[in-house]
Amino acid sequence: MGSNKSKPKDASQRRRSLEPSENVHGAGGAFPASQTPSKPASADGHRGPSAAFVPPAAEPKLFGGFNSSDTVTSPQRAGPLAGGVTTFVALYDYESRTETDLSFKKGERLQIVNNTEGDWWLAHSLSTGQTGYIPSNYVAPSDSIQAEEWYFGKITRRESERLLLNAENPRGTFLVRESETTKGAYCLSVSDFDNAKGLNVKHYKIRKLDSGGFYITSRTQFNSLQQLVAYYSKHADGLCHRLTTVCPTSKPQTQGLAKDAWEIPRESLRLEVKLGQGCFGEVWMGTWNGTTRVAIKTLKPGTMSPEAFLQEAQVMKKLRHEKLVQLYAVVSEEPIYIVTEYMNKGSLLDFLKGETGKYLRLPQLVDMSAQIASGMAYVERMNYVHRDLRAANILVGENLVCKVADFGLARLIEDNEYTARQGAKFPIKWTAPEAALYGRFTIKSDVWSFGILLTELTTKGRVPYPGMVNREVLDQVERGYRMPCPPECPESLHDLMCQCWRKEPEERPTFEYLQAFLEDYFTSTEPQYQPGENL
């Protein structure tokens, strides 16, 4: 298995006669195994075998981050617990970052000293006898299902497929997650391979008996999920393949750098490698407190009011979703520093234009767009507005993970050339006409920008409206001009772009719709897709 933390134990099975209630779905691979060259990624921080996807990108150019809320790439464990549970088990290794943190190893048992609220808990290690703060998303109650390595909790069907459809995963790689459709039920997701479909995923509903047991098919029942996993690890018994390996996943990011590390002193940061430069500042890879790799965005003095920034940052740090860059900490006096998690593949724009871009085909590009739509659907639910959605503000990590960065910052910029929405500093080619002309920025103007971003993806980073200057773009768009379908791009995807570019903002689709459309694109819209020279 990916690790030996929780190998399933042998179990006795209870067999009773009930009506058959088997629910099996096959999910075709959105990433056909033959399409993407694979290269082992760094195993650092992974719970299972190292993932693989595409050739290394060019030098990283920007910064990124991680968070967990609605859907998660790393398993989503339970939050604060009722019932007085105070003994927990570590799911991952953790190295202390401050003098008040507690280092621990995966599998270590920890006694919670204070109540289980917030992102950092005071804990006492039963192994070392030491006490300190721990990240709450790195532990789970002892002897609970959350402590099992194969339990991924509340992740979506699509996210489970994204994890399992890795060319390096052997047949039978699996995870257990909560069912999206049936409350109280679970789902066993298993990777499979056949010559017709290539790499694909099968999903089996795990139903619950009134007596508390579990079954996939009623002829074979179990007292616990642990027994079910142990049994199917030895016998396929109707599954596509016996369970072989726990699905590998990255160690999650902590919520914040440490307990009470929000407004931090400038001296605690070391700027090491300059990654990029823009109109309003620079982006660096650096270290916080001598212990933690971070990305640091430095803003030129005068870019925005420190007071307004701090107020907005309080809102931004509450936006928590795995497809949004989490804001870690700030230096709130000028020059303002914005600290986030470092993401090693840089900006999506550089990624598309770099060496990796030539290997990407439509399935990967559509999946990346679905991830961006997922992050923006969360922004939509939270009644927030991005204002500057484009490939340069999307960040890429291992396995083509995409996250939305720089949300909300554009509103605070005080540069006259920018606030007048004219000139080289303002991203006119990405901006909806009502926002560019009248300053009406809404989630619907973000939808327009998303349509432009889709052209960046399908052209591997080409500047929108090629050959046209900003003023010309504004005039032509007002007269009804819309970009034509990019070469090799299916008409169905261009039609989605045109929906995003409807003149009336309220007629544009929601991000919730865009996410669902793109996640199901190759089953519902383009099931006959065949790879071309570029897409």
Curated annotation (Swiss-Prot):
Gene3D superfamilies: Phosphorylase Kinase, domain 1 (3.30.200.20), SH2 domain (3.30.505.10), SH3 Domains (2.30.30.40), Transferase(Phosphotransferase) domain 1 (1.10.510.10). GO terms for biological process: angiotensin-activated signaling pathway; bone resorption; branching involved in mammary gland duct morphogenesis; cell migration; cellular response to fluid shear stress; cellular response to hydrogen peroxide; cellular response to peptide hormone stimulus; cellular response to platelet-derived growth factor stimulus. The modification Phosphotyrosine is found at residues 186, 418, 529. InterPro entries: Kinase-like_dom_sf, Non-receptor_tyrosine_kinases, Prot_kinase_dom, Protein_kinase_ATP_BS, Ser-Thr/Tyr_kinase_cat_dom, SH2, SH2_dom_sf, SH3-like_dom_sf. One of its GO terms (cellular component) is nucleoplasm. It holds the Pfam family PK_Tyr_Ser-Thr. It is a lipid-anchor. Phosphorylation by CSK at Tyr-529 inhibits kinase activity. Inhibitory phosphorylation at Tyr-529 is enhanced by heme. Further phosphorylation by CDK1 partially reactivates CSK-inactivated SRC and facilitates complete reactivation by protein tyrosine phosphatase PTPRC. Integrin engagement stimulates kinase activity. Phosphorylation by PTK2/FAK1 enhances kinase activity. Butein and pseudosubstrate-based peptide inhibitors like CIYKYYF act as inhibitors. Phosphorylation at Tyr-418 increases kinase activity. A lipid is attached at residue 2 (N-myristoyl glycine). Its EC number is 2.7.10.2. One of its GO terms (molecular function) is connexin binding. It is found in: Cell membrane; Mitochondrion inner membrane; Nucleus; Cytoplasm, Cytoskeleton. Keywords: ATP-binding, Cell adhesion, Cell cycle, Cell junction, Cell membrane, Cytoplasm, Cytoskeleton, Immunity, Kinase, Lipoprotein, Membrane, Mitochondrion, Mitochondrion inner membrane, Myristate, Nucleotide-binding, Nucleus, Phosphoprotein, Proto-oncogene, SH2 domain, SH3 domain, Transferase, Tyrosine-protein kinase, Ubl conjugation. PANTHER family: TYROSINE-PROTEIN KINASE. Non-receptor protein tyrosine kinase which is activated following engagement of many different classes of cellular receptors including immune response receptors, integrins and other adhesion receptors, receptor protein tyrosine kinases, G protein-coupled receptors as well as cytokine receptors. Participates in signaling pathways that control a diverse spectrum of biological activities including gene transcription, immune response, cell adhesion, cell cycle progression, apoptosis, migration, and transformation. This is Proto-oncogene tyrosine-protein kinase Src. It comes from Mus musculus (Mouse). The gene is Src.
